[in-house]
Amino acid sequence: MKKLLIIILFLFPSNSLAVEKNTTFTHEIFKKAQAENKIIVINSWNEFCLTCKKQIKILDQAKDKFKDIIFLSYEQTENKAIADILSIDYWTTIVIYKGKTEAYRSMGVTKKKDLYLAIEEVLKDKV
């Protein structure tokens, strides 16, 4: 049994599960986008979170579809100050702002249609 476990660990190294993403959130970008009344999608993630990995893949695709939207992300564990400012307590949280107003918040959503629908609903209300 011990040998089997060792073989499995070598076949599936833990870094293959890691999220490959950089923090793109900065206060300057966020405040400027708010001042310009832009729609901003913020995603909180963690390096070894599989749900986060699914969300990142969907949001990366959304960037191509929704060109006028600002997409920002940050690694939750290393950026507690950002999490505190945005009142985000958990990985997998996605928040959508319309200017300075929070228009949508979810946690753990991994269905593309649900995330796209949320973005489209905020776009419909665009002033």
Question: Which residues does each predicted region cover?
Answer:
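Thiol-based oxidoreductase modules, predominantly thioredoxin-like and allied folds used
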Residues: 44, 67-80
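Sec-dependent N-terminal signal peptides
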Residues: 4-13
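Typically the conserved alpha-helix immediately C-terminal to a functionally engaged Cys/Sec
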Residues: 51-65
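Structural micro-motif
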Residues: 86-95
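The canonical Cys-X-X-Cys-His
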Residues: 44, 49-52, 94
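Non-catalytic, surface beta->alpha helical segment in thiol-disulfide oxidoreductase systems
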Residues: 98-127
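N-terminal leader/targeting and pre-domain segments
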Residues: 17-37, 121-127
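Short active-site neighborhood of thiol/selenol oxidoreductases, capturing the structured segment around
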Residues: 35-47
